[in-house]
Amino acid sequence: MKSVLFLIPLVHAGEVVWDGFFNSSFTADQLDKWSWSNPVGPYQWYIHGSEATANYLEVSADFKNPADESDEKGIRISIDDTSSWNGQTMMRSELIPQTDADLGSGTLFYHFSLQSRRKTRPLRPLSIKLPSSRYFILSYSYTFPSHFTELKYGGDEETLRWLADGKTQWSTDLVAGTWYNFAYEIDFSAKTVGLWTSTGAEALKKVVEPVSAATQTDSKDWHVGELRLDNGQKGGKEDWFWSGVYIEKGEITTAIAGPAA
């Protein structure tokens, strides 16, 4: 009898080069162990305000996309009127991957899922007279404050926008309670950025073909979190919820379950 070989398709396709997944025992205070002299854990945590870490970060199984099977917990990243970092007028709560991996060569896919909630959803603009009052959500910058790709929310509308080199390439209404899944397709050689996205448990689909962008990095430039331009006014506290944060090369993993499923 001839043997029969069954080929079982893999759930994921690419090779993970870095991940920010949280296991069941991880707590937010573990991020306080990181320092320039003690670079431990998945993230650098130094861009934040003057309050304790618990004011800005919390991890919980309730904070992840239920379709994400690679994380056991998601993370709440909050921003408020204490979130000035180093005396800046902008408010910031941001995590940066802690890794020695090369995050700036070839083509890489930068994955994450994002949600706002009705009770803690981002505020409307502080004033319609302040069109620059907006949020930079998960940006990629080499020369701050320019971002070669980023999500933005706010201004004079409740729209979530994706930009490349400062130009809007995709947008959608931000609906509280909806999980938005993204992957930035960054080709550092061709200097282009494309976008894959979906909602809930739906598989990622490419919605923007690669467009030109000033892609450059020293592998320390991916900011996971929020930057708010308050222009000196009070903005209150807002929460965003994140899960499924990882970077891969090769073929893209489109399943929201992620590479560990």
Per-region residue spans from a language model:
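Cleavable N-terminal signal peptides of Sec/SRP-targeted secreted and luminal proteins
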Residues: 1-13
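Low-complexity, Ser/Thr/Pro/Gly-rich disordered linker/stalk regions
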Residues: 13-172, 189, 207-261
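Localized edge beta-strand/strand-to-loop motifs within extracellular or lumenal beta-rich domains
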Residues: 175-194, 199-200
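Beta-strand initiation motifs
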Residues: 203-205
